[in-house]
Amino acid sequence: MINMSSTLPTEPHRKAFIGSASNFWLHSSQTGFDLTHPSSPSESTLGRRITIQTTNTPITISPSKSALVIIDMQNFFLSSAFGRQKGAGHAACGQLIQHAIPAARKAGIRIIWLNWGLSAQDVQNMPPAVKRAFGFFAIPTSSDFTPGDAAFGDHPSSISVNKHGTPSSKASAYKGVGTDCGTLTLDDGTQVAAGKLLMADQWNSALYPPLDAIYTAGAQLPSTPDVWIHKDRMSGLWGGKTACEEFLQKEGITTLFFAGVNTDQCVGGTLTDAFSKGYDCVLLRDGCGTTSPACAQEAYEFNAAGTYGFCTSCAEFAKGVEEMKV
């Protein structure tokens, strides 16, 4: 009997450089993609290396050039005080706490908390399409708007309407970004002044409590402490340059692991802008969630793996760290 396996040709090992001299990956048909960004094609990156299995291929990263970017896991999006039911965002929170955050800490991977945190000037400059996404206020046609710029501020006779202009089905405490959310009741019966919607340093824009405690501890670390960066659009990397991009460039960070809410909005918007700006993009598929239909999550996972970069899980991220090479 002929052993057919012995007659099959062996695939040769292939290697490649992808990119340009200033920003490139290496690829090996045996070991996958190397995203460690050595200074030149003839050199190797010094220091620790982590290999992580993604949905399609292994990737190897440099912890010192990587960041875990956790987006918008704030009270407004997750707290039951705003009527948020337990869902995909809360499940993602659990995966981050159990796997991704401890792994990032162990590896010395920087954790960036990228959150809505508007100033009064941001609200004034915000275009209508972005404002509409969070609802707005409307007044009776028999009423008059306040003259000048004040017309864009809240009016005593106004009501809250959703992004389609339909009055809210139940009384809403806020009427769009920058408006007061009123007093809310927490699960334990405590009342809290929620502050102005998505503006910096308000209760509604604070991190969801389980994560807030983690950030507070991480911000005190002597080496690679956690950082909190405000954003003023769905994407934290939109336009010419944002505070997030300035930080990434200052720290020499090139590889970004994305998590948070909502996958198909702020997480996805930041990821696609990062892709266009030349960053290495990895979506932690169970470290992010959305209130949109399942197809929205699936589309971002599909495109992250096939076009924008790579897709993996929080557990695979942690497994890679456990097997980290020095």
Residue ranges and their predicted role:
Residues 69-71:
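Short hydrophobic beta-strand that contains or immediately precedes a catalytic carboxylate
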Residues 64, 81-116:
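A short alpha/beta connector and helix-capping loop motif
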Residues 85-89, 129-130, 275-276:
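Glycine-rich, phosphate-binding/catalytic loops in enzymes
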Residues 2-67, 99-102, 106-107, 134-326:
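Active-site-adjacent betaalpha module
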Residues 120-123:
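Short catalytic/ligand-binding loop motif for oxyanion handling, primarily in non-cytosolic enzymes
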Residues 125-137:
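Charged, often glycine-rich, active-site loop that binds/positions anionic groups
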Residues 73, 116, 286:
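Active-site loop/turn elements of alpha/beta-hydrolase fold enzymes
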Residues 74-81:
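Short acidic, Gly/Ser-rich segments with clustered Asp/Glu that frequently serve as metal-coordination loops
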